[in-house]
């Protein structure tokens, strides 16, 4: 069985790769004759990159917080962590689609829905991992206070609902959806 330290190191590597891949979602201009205008037209892609960079960064910090409360790991927890990492490393793809759609002003609402669904699935993966670890204090350290466990459980389980509500925002306005995701991230800092 993997050690907790090895799982943390692997997870850190996945987070690092995902956050690095985000920059590749911003396509360079294809026409350099009017470079200023071309760069200005890319601002929505840069905004999507910044929001996703912050979101993945917050996820990484939260991952470390969760692992500081976990005393031991077991096989089901490892697989739940892998499911979470699957959603994390996928974030650059919908970020690129979302940023490009916003920049082109084509298909932006559909792209916003895809981004929001991705974040909702990610939030559900967080919930599953936390609920498994904390249920009956299965994997938690004895030092972790019960009131903090309850607060964390509420935060993790409400995350899926909050992100799911962003799907509704996406159907109305893609730029509002991006702002909504920025605010969700800000609330988790």
Which positions does each model-derived feature cover?
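The first (N-terminal) embedded transmembrane alpha-helix
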Residues: 7-28
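Alpha-helical transmembrane segments
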Residues: 40-52, 107-125
């Amino acid at each position: 069985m993997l050690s907790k330290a090895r799982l943390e190191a692997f997870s850190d590597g996945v987070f690092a790769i995902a956050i690095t891949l985000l920059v590749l979602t911003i396509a360079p201009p294809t026409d350099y004759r009017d470079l200023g205008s071309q760069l200005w037209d890319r601002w929505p892609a840069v905004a999507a990159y910044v929001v996703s960079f912050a979101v993945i960064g917050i996820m990484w910090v939260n991952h470390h917080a969760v692992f500081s409360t976990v005393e031991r790991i077991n096989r089901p927890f490892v697989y739940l962590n892998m499911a979470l990492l699957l959603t994390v490393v996928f974030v650059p793809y919908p970020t690129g689609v979302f940023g490009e759609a916003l920049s082109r002003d084509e298909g932006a609402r559909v792209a916003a829905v895809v981004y929001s669904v991705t974040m909702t699935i990610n939030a559900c993966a967080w919930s599953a991992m936390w609920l498994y670890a904390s249920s009956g204090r299965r994997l938690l350290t004895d030092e972790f206070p019960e009131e903090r466990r309850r607060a964390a459980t509420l935060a993790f389980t409400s995350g899926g609902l909050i992100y799911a509500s962003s799907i509704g925002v996406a159907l109305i306005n893609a730029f509002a959806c991006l702002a909504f995701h920025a605010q969700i991230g800000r609330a988790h800092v």
